[in-house]
Amino acid sequence: MQRGIVWVVDDDSSIRWVLERALAGAGLTCTTFENGAEVLEALASKTPDVLLSDIRMPGMDGLALLKQIKQRHPMLPVIIMTAHSDLDAAVSAYQQGAFDYLPKPFDIDEAVALVERAISHYQEQQQPRNVQLNGPTTDIIGEAPAMQDVFRIIGRLSRSSISVLINGESGTGKELVAHALHRHSPRAKAPFIALNMAAIPKDLIESELFGHEKGAFTGANTIRQGRFEQADGGTLFLDEIGDMPLDVQTRLLRVLADGQFYRVGGYAPVKVDVRIIAATHQNLEQRVQEGKFREDLFHRLNVIRVHLPPLRERREDIPRLARHFLQVAARELGVEAKLLHPETEAALTRLAWPGNVRQLENTCRWLTVMAAGQEVLIQDLPGELFESTVAESTSQMQPDSWATLLAQWADRALRSGHQNLLSEAQPELERTLLTTALRHTQGHKQEAARLLGWGRNTLTRKLKELGME
């Protein structure tokens, strides 16, 4: 199999230069173009094995170019590149038939590997993707690699109604992802029905899911449709599926197998066509081992797994998320959006965020109301944010350790708006160590220097700098 011919189109000459040399270094023949019109003109006489195209270019953008290429050369794999790493870009690229999606900045070795995979795909004459364009936008934001993986999965599932299991800590945005999977699916125009298993009393879950007949139990005065019937033709999102009682799990498994169920108190089967998206913050494999979750139901639901990372594992997304939530809160309250001081933005990025994206969103709502000025300063942030971060960072330390005390001091200083903490702390640290060492050696400087790991001249200089002569 020959190495392959690659075309690159990007209005950024530096991107063209880097890719051309990297691809040539991998033994591939590379030709570069500045705009989409040049590519279409060249395609009239020859065809590459793969095309890499930027998504935002003057004149014809990457998606418009992709559309024309798919009309003329439907088997040609196209990789869409973009510095604007958002869900809509990923989904639009996949739905118009892109082979894959490459967010900038990219690792050059990964880019070359992706190109080689696309060439192999083309040379083996596999069928392309060709799906209708996307639905409404969502508020899923993420440039972190883990979130790009989530976008990629949503894009690849955009023509499917397969079951999906979403797992992630509380507050990571599992329902947002479920909505996105529904919006970008063939069922987008049908209902999306959500039900949180943890929020429903156990004795009402069956009635909520499957409905009930009139007279099925005390208070059942009319026939009631359950969530399965309400979601017919669409998507049923079962949040916190790990909390579902075992007897209801058995009924759910039967519905997934047969496509029909009986209302509570009913004798006539009700047929439904429903896609199931389930979510949990629990370890379902462990629940299966403990006998708290049916293994056969787990395998029914776990066809495609989507893992949502906690916010602490995607810190690069925090500034963009915070700006977005401040804009949303301002629109809701009819006020001007707050701005984040650069130091505040940096502080938000360092915090623990045990409540994940939901906690960040609520913090931005709080700041919109409570921050005094138009620009949010560090001292405007609620104190509990720092307390949770200190608690997490010192959880492995002894309560009276010097590191714990230092962390608590730094926390108080940052909350008071102090800057240049190191220049403030280092002299005090050295003064404390010197005083203690000299006390330990009864004032013998050479011995104190040895204990501290300094030379005698260094100790003499430090005593002078610190005013301790």
UniProtKB/Swiss-Prot annotation:
SMART domains xrefs: AAA, REC
GO MF term list: ATP binding; ATP hydrolysis activity; cis-regulatory region sequence-specific DNA binding; DNA-binding transcription activator activity; phosphorelay response regulator activity
Domain annotation Response regulatory: ranges: 5-119
Broad class of where this protein is predominantly found: cytoplasm
Modified sites of kind 4-aspartylphosphate: D54
Taxonomy, superkingdom: Bacteria
Name assigned to this protein: DNA-binding transcriptional regulator NtrC
Organism expressing this protein natively: Escherichia coli (strain K12)
Taxonomy of the source species: Bacteria, Pseudomonadati, Pseudomonadota, Gammaproteobacteria, Enterobacterales
Gene: glnG
